[in-house]
């Protein structure tokens, strides 16, 4: 985790400690996670990946390893990494149990200083990870390791809904001090070195279904309530794209 930048080094150490605790079983998940609300966003991302046979895939922030497992099942030769040694260990354990470890490598390293060769990946994937990073350094590294024409898919929380920001301020125990959800208006400058990017937003009116998970029995009704709201959201966002700034999540597709 060594870095020549002492501020970045301190940040990396804080992130590693937080996520080591999280993946060691500490109660660091909000209540609404029991309803798995981000599964809908992940499904959209996974479906966009298509067949990964013959492709080298880089996974950012492997966490518990379930995305790593899916990438391997889709045929990818996966290189996964995390800042947390505990996350890397959990991922290796899951892959070994499912007979997929030979298709994957799992390492501990910072996204701001990757140990991979230039232009060595066809695809990069990350879920709720890049908002934890020094974006300028991490995106420069992403550009370096992607092949020409390579694609990065990242699902990330957004920063500009005031109700979500209020909730975040009220629940600091569930997040790190350094994380910074994304702002859509900043994407063009952040991604200027890439050939193109596109994004789709999720959870506008469907945030009401997430809020319901805090009511008694709310997690049980979440699937039935969220499905029509997702359809409404997509119609609203097609009609008025600028409403995306008020959404909870964005799904980025970045092409080198």
What is each stretch, according to the model?
Residues 123-136:
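A short SAM/SAH-binding and catalytic strip from SAM-dependent methyltransferases
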């Amino acid at each position: 985790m060594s870095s020549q930048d002492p501020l970045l080094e301190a940040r990396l150490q804080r992130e590693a400690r937080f996520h080591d605790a999280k993946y060691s079983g500490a109660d660091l998940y909000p209540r609404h996670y029991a309803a798995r609300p981000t599964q809908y966003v992940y499904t959209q991302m996974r479906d966009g990946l298509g067949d990964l046979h013959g492709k080298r895939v880089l996974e950012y922030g492997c966490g518990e390893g379930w995305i790593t497992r899916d990438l391997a099942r889709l045929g990818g030769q996966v290189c996964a990494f995390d800042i947390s040694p505990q996350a890397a260990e959990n991922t290796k354990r899951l892959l070994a149990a499912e007979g997929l470890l030979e298709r994957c490598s799992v390492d501990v390293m910072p996204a701001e200083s990757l140990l991979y060769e230039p232009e060595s990946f066809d695809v990069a994937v990350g879920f709720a990870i890049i908002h934890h990073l020094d974006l300028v350094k991490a995106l420069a590294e992403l550009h370096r390791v992607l092949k020409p024409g390579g694609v990065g898919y990242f699902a990330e929380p957004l920063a500009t809904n005031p109700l979500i920001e209020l909730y975040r301020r009220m629940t600091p125990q569930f997040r790190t001090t350094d994380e910074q959800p994304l702002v859509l208006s900043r994407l063009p400058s952040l991604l200027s070195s890439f050939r193109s990017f596109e994004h789709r937003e999720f959870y506008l009116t469907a945030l009401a279904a997430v809020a319901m998970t805090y009511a008694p029995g709310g997690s049980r009704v979440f699937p039935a309530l969220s499905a029509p709201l997702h359809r409404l959201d997509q119609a609203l966002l097609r009609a008025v794209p600028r409403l995306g700034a008020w959404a909870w999540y964005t799904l980025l597709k970045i092409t080198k």
